[in-house]
Amino acid sequence: SGGPVSIVNADLIREISFYTGAFPADRSGAMSSVLDFRLRDGNPDKQTYKATLGASEVSFSGNGHLSDKTTYLFSIRQSYLQLLFKALGLPFLPNFIDGQFKLKTKLSAHDELTVLGLVGIDKMKLNTDEKGEDAEYILSYLPTIHQETFTIGASYRHYAGKHVQTLTLSHNYLNNRNVKYLNNDDSSEDNLTLRLRSVEQKTTFRFENRTRLGQWTLKEGAEVNYSNYTNRTKQRILSSSSIYHTDLNIFSWGGFFSTDYISTNKRFSASAGIRTDGNNYNQEMKELWKQLSPRFSLSYDLTKQWALSGSAGLYYQLPPYTALGFKDNDGIYINKNLKYMQVLETSLGLDWHLEDRLMISAEGFLKQYGRMPLSVRDNIPLACKGDDYGTVGNEVLIPTERGRAYGIETMLRWQVPGQFNFVSSLTLFRSEFRDIPSAWDNRFILNVSGTFNLSRRWSIGGKLSYIGGAPYTPYDEDKSSLVEAWNAQGRPYYDYSKYNTERLPNFAQFDVRIDKSFYFHRCMVGFYIDIQNITGSKLKQQDVIMSTGVIENPSAPIGEQRYKMKYLKQESGTVLPSIGLTVEF
């Protein structure tokens, strides 16, 4: 969704459906979760606008109508985080621009056309003026990053009594460029350690028909996709430079059918569906029956307050393009043996609610993963890589890894309209591959948030986040100290023979926000103060080993020379205040 700052303006969202299981059959490529959000329609009666000026960004949005049959909404946002980050003394300076729009027009009483688009531009440069050991380490490996992404699509919908047909054509694009020089000295190309440009594009055409038959709803549809992935990389690997080019084209297809049922008294509901997908990457993936994806869910109200629910499903997802498009030195796609990744999910839940004001729920879940890509070089799952800047998947892989995740999630929601709302969730879980903790095995996640509306249009809100420490792999000091190895990537190498044998401490963060609104004739002015991590909590990472730049054995052959290393304490977290002004008119 755009990294730590979402690319989508939340003010424009009408509704969000978040699935962690029981995925709808009309959504492909889901293994972990599905975030399905729908934008509001523009205002058919009047034009409204909103401008926001904050400590880190400025934005402008609006919605209204172009004619009696056509409505619009839009949003554009520009950050100046680089100024804030420089003032805080951080070694990297991010900047982003994002925007979105939606046009909807009624062609007739039974036909409508919707066009929407999203765009995001990210640029991150380095603050080489920042001094200190922590900044020195981050600057030693972090590249400059330029990234552009956009999605544009059009949807035609025809209403025919009990039937609704939808035709959708969309295209998404991602252009990523990373550049890194040794010691950040770009005065000579001899200092270049990384120049990467990768482009991912996907064009999708889909048809869907929905039929309502009393208590039943039927859905069926099909889609075709064309994907293109290119990568042009020049990278230093130990003593030599590697030039890597790849160009991957994939044609894929899929179909689905699902049915939903709700009893006349609304106490029982059920959903069942099946989906299959295929593509022309290899023979295994062409065979649709090998990716048959059934799913089933039900819910039953035991009483007016108690409800029981459950779901089960087998889901598939294509491995990342970096893995599918990886070539060897002879230009041959070396990962042609990969398969669709799969997960078998089951869940059982119970919830209690008092009207719409108070709800308590608990759900147990089990996810069993199979056919996951395994790194031949490091003997760890590909899914456990990529929690830092860099490219993941450009290596030899085999589809043999298995894993599982299981746990229980509880939630409490309490709200009194116009006065306050309170939401909390606690998830206790384990995530493992071959009975070894995965990179995501934090054991627990607690989130508590609330907003209170005070008199005279004041409101105050807070959010507490508490997460268990993740496992980590110690560094390989012997390999990292080699001059050629260190100069190649400017950071230490992991000792994967000790994969995830250590664990970080837990971390908690508390955020506070205060809002005040003033209403005038045809205008609303709002002020806010937002303080993230008000307690100044520190997120601790494993101590990092770093080159001092001093060679211990300068007379040894170049391949045996070693840097004298030092350890740096790694922790992050600062109080981040922000103040802003919002105007609606």
Label each PLM-derived region with a short phrase.
Residues 1-18:
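Short acidic/polar hinge/loop motifs at secondary-structure boundaries
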Residues 15-26, 32-40, 47-91, 98-106, ...:
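Predominantly transmembrane beta-strands of Gram-negative outer membrane beta-barrel pores used
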Residues 104-122, 143-285, 354, 358-361, ...:
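Face-selective signature of the C-terminal outer-membrane beta-barrel domain
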Residues 118, 215-219, 223, 243-370, ...:
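Structural signature of Gram-negative outer-membrane beta-barrels, strongest in the C-terminal barrel
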Residues 129-134, 230-235, 304-346, 366-390, ...:
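Surface-exposed extracellular loop regions of Gram-negative outer-membrane beta-barrel proteins
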Residues 196-198, 202-206, 246-256, 335, ...:
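Outer membrane beta-barrel strand-and-loop segments of large Gram-negative receptors
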Residues 263-265, 366-368, 389-469:
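Gram-negative outer-membrane beta-barrel transporters
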Residues 370, 422, 466-489, 505-509, ...:
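C-terminal beta-signal and adjacent terminal beta-strands/loops
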